[in-house]
Structures are given as C-alpha cells and as structure tokens.
Regions:
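Short, well-ordered amphipathic alpha-helical segments that serve as non-catalytic structural scaffolds
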Residues: 3, 59-75, 133-141
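Short, surface-exposed alpha-helical recognition segments that flank or form part
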Residues: 55-60, 121-125
Length: 171
C-alpha cells in the first residue's frame, strides 16, 4: 500500500479545483461487497478482508463514468478540453473500461494518451495511485505525458465502502 497527500491553499489566481462529485453507496448490496471472513485454508483460523471483485468491478463501471460526467458537466469545461484523466489504478482493465464508458456518454472515444498508467510499475498502491501518477506527470517523469498551467484534468476514484469521487481540476 501507499499513501498520498495534497496541500491545498487559497490563492488569488485561476485554477485548482473547479468542481467535484462524491457519493457513498451504503445499501445492503454494496455493503456486502466487502466482508471479514475466515481463510479458505482449513488450518488457518485468521480473519481476512474479502472482496467480491466482480461486483466491485461492475459497480465501478456503472458509477464512476456517471460521476465523472456529472462533475465535468457541472464545470465550465467540456470533454474536448480535458487533457488528462487520472483514475485510481486498482485494475488496468477496469480503468480502460471506465474511460471508454465515460467517453461513450459523450458519443466519443478517448484520445491516445489521455489516461496515463503506472499500475504495471507500482501496482495498486491504494489511495496513493492518483497523487503519485499526477506527480509523475507534472514532473515529466512519465514518457509521453505532460501538463501545462491552465490544462484541464479529471481525477476519479472508486473505493471500498462503496465510494465514488470525481474532480475537475485546472493545473
């Protein structure tokens, strides 16, 4: 696992957080996606956190693109102005599916390189994936990815609980 932090301060210039959407889903269906249970190994009585991975995957594909669209639509920007999309990197296949479903909501397809990825190098580093990825792109440490002042980006995540978040941000 990893950790990420962001320092926010009020400034008298354009940029920063333009809009955000956050939702927590607490119905009995979503709460059941995670549980604490005994190991599958008979000789081990320890308790482990278990996740219904397919259910989480389906939940993410259903809810994250909608949160991203709602967040972007309520900002003063459109899909063609988004330079990069940073999605929590739990699963590369899932992130690509989220990205494609998001663009499909606009009857569009994602441009090449709009979604930088580090999962093949860092794995799923928990809440650190988005801040780490953003930092790597800002510092031009990720080949073929960069940002400039004024660029519009989207941040998105899905997490245990179940929580969905999206932020429209201007660099």
């Amino acid at each position: 696992d990893g950790a990420g932090a962001t320092i926010l301060e009020k400034v008298n210039e354009n940029g920063g957080i333009i809009n955000h959407k956050s939702s927590t889903f607490t119905s009995s269906d979503e709460i059941d996606f995670l549980s604490v249970e005994k190991s599958y190994k008979i000789e081990n009585n320890n308790q482990f956190i278990k996740m219904k991975g397919r259910k989480v995957y389906e939940f993410a594909l259903r809810n994250v693109p909608l949160a991203m669209k709602s967040c972007l639509d309520d900002s003063s920007f459109n899909i063609n102005q988004v330079k990069k999309i940073f999605i929590h990197q739990a699963n590369k296949k899932m992130d690509h599916a989220i990205l494609n479903r998001f663009y499909k909501l606009y009857n569009s397809i994602p441009s090449e390189g709009v979604m930088p990825m580090l999962i093949e190098f860092l794995g799923n580093s928990s809440v650190a994936t988005v801040p780490t990825l953003y930092d790597q792109v800002l510092r031009k440490k990720l080949k073929n990815h960069s940002l400039s002042k004024g660029d519009i980006v989207l941040f998105a995540s899905v997490g245990a609980g179940m929580n969905v978040n999206a932020i429209t941000y201007q660099v």
